[in-house]
């Protein structure tokens, strides 16, 4: 991982996470649902936009710092768009194809984002809080989330239904992250 003076990793299109080098114990369960995790390219943008709209994220733009997980048969299985505010990476948003949810794709994508960018901050939709806690994320105060990200919730008509929770995915939870109990 290359880092800049700001402490944020500099991701490059050629830096794909090689899943073939990981043992089954290093990977989340069901990780065979994806071929690689890499930086997005302009060819990926239409699929990212469609997935974002299908996940009720509105129309997204600005994909310079977006990771994608590709499906073995081609196409985008998931994406994680990051925004850097005050030197901190904010996930905004992460979307996994509905048919692949529950197979470790989101966990692998979050781990790859954390490896590239360091600690991650984000706002979790209420129904996803259990997943984020499972991979090692912890709740934080709203003041720890960039106003540019938090305002998405402030202006959302579904806020009461969604029950958003500000969270972070810290570096110090590396041992616990995405490694399910093998008991």
What are these regions (language model features)?
Residues 8-15, 36-47:
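A short beta-loop-alpha structural element at the N-terminal edge
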Residues 65-78:
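Conserved beta-hairpin
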Residues 75-83, 88-95:
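Conserved beta-strand in the GNAT
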Residues 94-101, 127:
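A short, internal acetyl-CoA/4′-phosphopantetheine-binding micro-motif in the GNAT/acyltransferase core
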Residues 102-115:
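Conserved acetyl-CoA-binding loop-helix of GNAT-fold acetyltransferases
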Residues 115-127:
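Conserved GNAT acetyl-CoA-binding A-motif
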Residues 126-152:
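Conserved active-site alpha-helix within GNAT-family acetyltransferase domains
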Residues 145-183:
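C-terminal "cap" of GNAT-fold acetyltransferases
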